[in-house]
Amino acid sequence: MLRPALLCLACLAPRPATACETALLLAMDVSNSVDVAEYRIQAEGLALALADPVISEILVQDQIAIAVMQWAGEQRQQLSIGWTSMTSAASVAGLAARAMAMERAFVLSDTAPGPALHAAIDAFGSAPDCRRKVIDVSGDGTPNSGGSPAAARQRAERAGITVNALAIEAPGHGLAVSNFFRRALITRDGFVITARGHRAYTETLRRKILREISRVTG
């Protein structure tokens, strides 16, 4: 399924070098509420989103830098894919392949978005110099460890980092995760997008990344 999308990346025309527009860190929830199949949906969904022709073109055009972090409990965060600049079709294809093959970092762990957000902010210490800094948090549950993320959110705002969130809600249920992210996690300039179940994750993530990397004009 990924192969045709990766082949499309070869169609991207080379572009003149430009300054990095956005440093985007994707923070994936791998806590105990995410089972084996759901983790694979997340990893494969990320790979497919990166290989989307529209997203791929913007990534290269704006020299966007991407990193991927997995998070779970209070002391469980891992930068699984370090900062990678999208300077060519080959670099986008390589990142998509790495996301597809990425092994799960943690199992049987709590859900601690506060410490995860602190770790994501720390990761920008080694990020390329980009005009915008964005953290994209995805998750399917509210915290049961690590306390409130309020201090981490304030820290992100002071650092000029936008925090957005993708809430994975069980089909037919309420919006507990979406409401928590909106109330306690995202920055004032951030947004929340909701996927109804993990099966909707891939398309929702694609729309979310496209929104995050598209330049706002006017």
Which role does the model predict for each range below?
Residues 171-217:
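Von Willebrand factor A/integrin I-like adhesion domains
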Residues 142-183:
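VWA/integrin I-like adhesion module and closely mimicked acidic/polar interface patches used
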Residues 27-37, 82, 100-110, 138-143, ...:
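Second-shell loop/turn segments in exported
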Residues 108-159, 210, 214, 218:
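Exposed acidic/Ser/Thr-rich ligand/metal-binding surfaces
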Residues 14-16:
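N-terminal signal peptide c-region/cleavage motif recognized by signal peptidases
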Residues 1-5:
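Bacterial N-terminal signal peptides that target proteins for export
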Residues 20-82, 85-86, 93-138, 164-177, ...:
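Von Willebrand factor
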